[in-house]
Regions:
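Active-site loop segments of alpha/beta catalytic cores
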Residues: 1-147
Length: 147
């Protein structure tokens, strides 16, 4: 279950945890088979990050939020799924539970995400096509940042 993710975070023991099987199993099976292992990993790691396969893992969200030591949830929209913008209430629930969020966004998704979520603990990666576009993105984020 250990994977490497270059997320720009400095930690002695940082790792991306995931359970891709969870998209095919019930909540009961997830709680029985995956949660004990995820809990052990959270206890071991200094900076545990969970790779969350968007809408397909939403049924397991409450279990994941119960992992007290889980620091970050990386929301991943699987090909063909709607943008993370469509799941603002779910992302807000993650923040309310004290979890940071890591998103892979397109430039046009930044504004609604920044307006709908607190900037505290919000991390995202976005590709710019030029230096000018990157500068505009930074200015937009600075303008829209809020608690």
């Amino acid at each position: 279950m250990f994977c490497r993710l270059a997320a720009g975070m400095v930690a002695r023991l940082m790792s991306q945890m995931q359970c891709d099987l969870s998209v095919m199993i019930s909540e009961n099976d997830f709680n029985t088979f995956a949660m004990p292992e995820l809990r052990k990993q959270c206890d071991f790691l200094q900076f545990p990050l969970y790779h969350f396969d968007g809408q397909e893992q939403r049924r397991h969200l409450q279990s994941l939020l119960s992992l007290e030591k889980l620091r970050v949830i990386q929301w991943t929209s699987v090909v063909g799924q709607p943008s993370p913008v469509e799941y603002l209430p779910t992302l807000q629930a993650m923040q309310k539970a004290g979890k940071s969020i890591f998103l892979m966004l397109k430039p046009y998704e930044i504004e609604p995400i920044m307006q709908g979520l607190s900037s505290k603990g919000l991390h995202f990666s976005v590709e710019a096509q030029s230096v000018e576009e990157a500068d505009a993105i930074v200015k937009l984020v600075e303008k829209l940042s809020h608690e």
